[in-house]
Amino acid sequence: MSLRTPKRSRTSDEQEQEQEQEQVQNPDTHVNNEHQQRPGPTTLLSTPVRLKNGFGTPSPPSPPGITKSITKSRRRPSTTSLQGIFMSPVNKRRVGITAHGRVYDHNDDGHESESEDDENEEENENQKKYDGHVSMPLLPPTTPKSRRSEVFLSPSPRLRSPPTAARRSTGERPIREISHTLRTRLNYALVKLQNGWTDKTLPELETELAPAVQTPPRRYHNRFPDSADAGTSAHTAFLQALGGHPPREEATAVETLMLLSSPTKKQQHRPVPATSAGEPTDETEPESDTEVETS
C-alpha cells in the first residue's frame, strides 16, 4: 500500500517564477497579456477590448494554445490599482453612465465595437451638459395657512382680462346702487302681481289710485271746557274736541240721506225750507214717513 504525498499549494514566488519562464519562452504572448491587463477606455462592467496599433478595433482571436497560457499568466490586480481606477473622475462618470442603462454593441467575438473617438465625443457632451446645468431655486413649501392667504389676495391688474379692465370706468356706479334699484323694481313688480295690475302702466295706476290716497280734511274745533264742567284735564278737552260735531250739520246730513233714499217724497219736502221762520213746521210728518218705510 503506497502512501501518496498531498500536493503542495503553489506559493506566489513559484507562480512568479513560472510566469517569468513562460514570458521568456513566449515573448509575443507576454505583449498581448500586458495589453489585456492595461485598463482600457471601456467600462469595468463590459468585456475588455484588444488594442491594435493604438486603436480600439478588435484584433483576431489568438490560437487556443496561446489563450491557455494567457489565462494561466493572468494576475489579479491589487486593491491599490482598483482604488485608483475607481476613484478617477473619468471612471466615475463611466460607471454612472452604465448605471443609467448604457448598452454597448458587441460583435460576433463578444468584444465591444465602440471606438475611442466615440467615447471621447460622448464624454465631451456629458461634460457640456454638467457644465451648462443651472440649479433651479427651491420654492418655499405650501402650507394651509399660506394657501388660505393666497385665496384672499386680489389678482394684479396684469392678470385681468382686457375686456374686463376696459369695461370698468371711474364714473361707473358701484354695485350696491345697482342692486338697490333692482330690488326696488322687483318689489314694484311683486305689488303689481299681487293686486292684479300687471296689464297697467305706472301712469295709469297713479291716476286711478290718486283719489283714493287723498283723505278729506277734517275740521278741528278747539272748544275749551267751561268752568262748570267737571273734567278740567287736557285729555278730556281733546276728546271733546274730536267727538264734538255741530248739531245742525248732523241734521242736514240725515235729511239729505232721507231725500236720496225716497225720491218720491222729495217734492213733499221741498216747500219746507221755503216757509217763513215764524211759521211752525210740522215735525211729526217725517217721523211718520220713517215709520212707514221701516214697516
UniProtKB/Swiss-Prot annotation:
Keywords carried by this UniProt record: Cell cycle, Cytoplasm, Nucleus, Phosphoprotein, Repressor, Transcription, Transcription regulation
Triggers of expression: By transcription factor HCM1 during S phase.
Protein name: G1-specific transcriptional repressor WHI5
GO molecular function: RNA polymerase II-specific DNA-binding transcription factor binding; transcription coregulator activity; transcription corepressor activity
Phosphoserine: modified positions: S59, S62, S88, S113, S115, S154, S156, S161, S262, S288
GO CC annotation terms, alphabetical: cytoplasm; nucleus; SBF transcription complex
Start-end of Low complexity biased regions: 153-168
Spans annotated as Disordered: 1-171, 249-295
Acidic residues: bias regions: 114-124, 280-295
Subcellular location: Cytoplasm; Nucleus
Subunit relationships: Interacts with the heterodimeric transcription factors SBF (SWI4-SWI6 cell-cycle box binding factor) and MBF (MluI cell-cycle box binding factor), each composed of the transcriptional coactivator SWI6 and a sequence-specific DNA-binding protein SWI4 or MBP1, respectively.
Described function: Transcriptional repressor that negatively regulates G1-specific, SBF- and MBF-dependent transcription. Binds via SBF to promoters of G1-specific genes to repress transcription in early G1. During G1, phosphorylated by cyclin-CDK CLN3-CDC28 and progressively hyperphosphorylated by CDK associated with other G1-cyclins, which leads to dissociation of WHI5 from SBF, activating SBF-dependent transcription in late G1. Elimination of CDK activity at the end of mitosis by the mitotic exit network (MEN) allows WHI5 to reassociate with SBF to again repress G1/S transcription.
PTM comment text: Phosphorylation by the cyclin-dependent kinase (CDK) CDC28 controls both subcellular location and association of WHI5 with SBF.
Gene label: WHI5
Xref: InterPro entries: Srl3/Whi5, TF_Nrm1/Whi5
